[in-house]
Amino acid sequence: MDGVIVIRKEKGFTSHDVVAKLRGILHMKKIGHTGTLDPDAEGVLPVALGKATRLVDMITDKEKTYEAVMRLGVVTDTQDMSGTVLSQTTELSVTEEELCTVVSSFVGDYMQVPPMYSALKVNGKKLYELAREGKTVERKPRPVHFYEIEILDISFPLVRFRVTCSKGTYIRTLCHDIGEKLGCGAAMESLLRTKVGRFTLDDAITLAQTEEAVQEGTIESKILGIEEILAEYPRVCCTKEGDRLLANGNPLVQALVDAQEKNGWI
């Protein structure tokens, strides 16, 4: 099986847990997920199968959409409600107008400092491993982009919003930074990823549904083929020499592009 299966990751599973379970369900080893979701987060997790694992970087590079709930008035060490509370207040002086102004100020390019509780590595060691040892290290801000942030509901201290952003963005850090700018602190209460590139919740199935499809013999219908995944990209024909170079992992140069489809295509 070569293609992508879109899994609806449930709470309590890491992205690596999903891959491990799929290897058992599908009886195949060549599987890779296309973007980490925290254990407490849920939603769209495209998983590449077989030859489609070569496309992981292309899929991961796509913009992502989330629905999140943040709790104002609390700061935790993990920037979400699973962590240890560092400070808390029940007296919020934030108005809806102030909230909307601060939230909208994050739209566009932003230099985001990754959280200590993350899988990023420093000197070969993951940040969350250092954090669990009680260590804090300097993290360099990374450029991210927020295409849109829409507030869906305000029920202080809870605020529900939808955000579309670039890859590598931490939504719990966004919540933390919003709280910091408001002066009251904030932490992420829940997170649902609703879209990764072209893949949406409507495309997603749970691990249990995947196992059921295998048992019923309908699993092939749940997998998007490589050609379908690449349909959004321009189709370029190349010469036989170009075919040979591509097959060996070499880049294609303009001189090896041919308008005649009979010689192959990529």
Residue locations for each model-derived region?
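The conserved catalytic core of RNA pseudouridine synthases
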Residues: 24-28, 42, 46, 137-168, ...
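Short, structured patches in soluble enzyme cores that scaffold and shape functional sites
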Residues: 70-72, 132, 150-153, 163-167, ...
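Extended alpha-helical targeting/anchoring segments
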Residues: 118, 122-148
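Accessory RNA 3′-end/elbow-binding domains used by RNA modification enzymes
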Residues: 1-10, 14-37, 41-44, 59-62, ...
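Acidic, low-complexity central loop/insert segments
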Residues: 58-111
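Short, charged/polar surface micro-motifs in flexible loops or helix N-caps
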Residues: 50-53, 75
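Residue-level signal for inorganic ion chemistry
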Residues: 47, 68, 124, 174, ...
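Structural signature of FAD isoalloxazine-binding scaffolds in flavoprotein oxidoreductases
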Residues: 57-72, 137-151
